[in-house]
Structures are given as C-alpha cells and as structure tokens.
Design a protein with these regions (language model features):
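Short, flexible segments with low predicted structural confidence
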Residues: 1-2, 17, 33-34
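Glycine-rich beta-strand-turn "strand-cap" elements at beta-sheet edges
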Residues: 2, 36-48, 76-101
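Short, well-ordered beta-strand segments in beta-rich or mixed alpha/beta enzyme
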Residues: 3-8, 38-68
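Short, surface-exposed ligand-recognition loops at beta-strand->loop->(often short) alpha-helix junctions
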Residues: 9-20
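Residue-level signal for secondary-structure boundary sites
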Residues: 14-16, 60-62, 100
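Intrinsically disordered, low-complexity segments enriched in polar/charged residues with Gly/Pro
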Residues: 14-15, 25-28, 40-42
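An amphipathic, aromatic/His-enriched active-site/gating alpha helix that lines ligand/cofactor pockets
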Residues: 24-36, 55-91
Length: 101
C-alpha cells in the first residue's frame, strides 16, 4: 500500500469551494485506478491549510493512474479550480503505508 499527502493553502475566503473541488476530483476517478481511499481535511486551528490524503494499492498503480488518459479532461477542470482557490503550488509527501487497521 502507498499513500500521498498533499498540503495546500487556500486563498482567503475560498473554504466554501472545497466541496466543488472534491466533487470534480471524485468525478474523474476510474474504477480500476488502484485508489483505495481519498480524504480532504482542513486544519482545525488554520482552516486555510488543507490536506488531501490519497491511499492506493501501490506506488506503481499511483503512477499509472497519473498517466491515465481517461482522467485528463476532468483533471483539467480540477486544476482550473485549484488555480482559483489555492495560494500556491501544493506540497507532496510520498508515504509507504506500514500498517493499516
């Protein structure tokens, strides 16, 4: 199992746009992508700080998913939303899942 933690900062006042982004990302997902779970979370002390945790079967499946042409059109729309609401580029942290319960 493999995961990626994505951390971003929202532009001021853009918290209400997160459900729109989540819906767009959910819409582009393919049933055979290897995705096990996605979570979108806001920092309780700093709601402008957002974390997305994506858990996949393996890093190999994650890299295949990144290149899947079936997702491209929908991802363009998601990237447009991100450009509107994020203050800068996301920070990516790749994680090996040691235990899951």
């Amino acid at each position: 199992m493999w995961a990626q933690l994505i951390t971003v900062r929202l532009k001021p006042g853009r918290e209400a746009d997160l459900p729109r982004l989540a819906a767009q990302l959910r819409a582009v997902e393919q049933p055979d992508s290897g995705l096990l779970r996605s979570m979108l979370m806001q920092d309780q002390q700093d709601p402008g700080r957002v974390h997305m945790l994506v858990v996949l079967e393996s890093e190999e499946k994650a890299r295949e998913r990144e290149q899947d042409p079936r997702r491209e059109e929908g991802l363009q729309a998601a990237r447009a939303i991100m450009a509107e609401i994020f203050e800068g580029p996301p920070e990516f942290t790749d994680l090996t899942v040691s235990e899951d319960w």
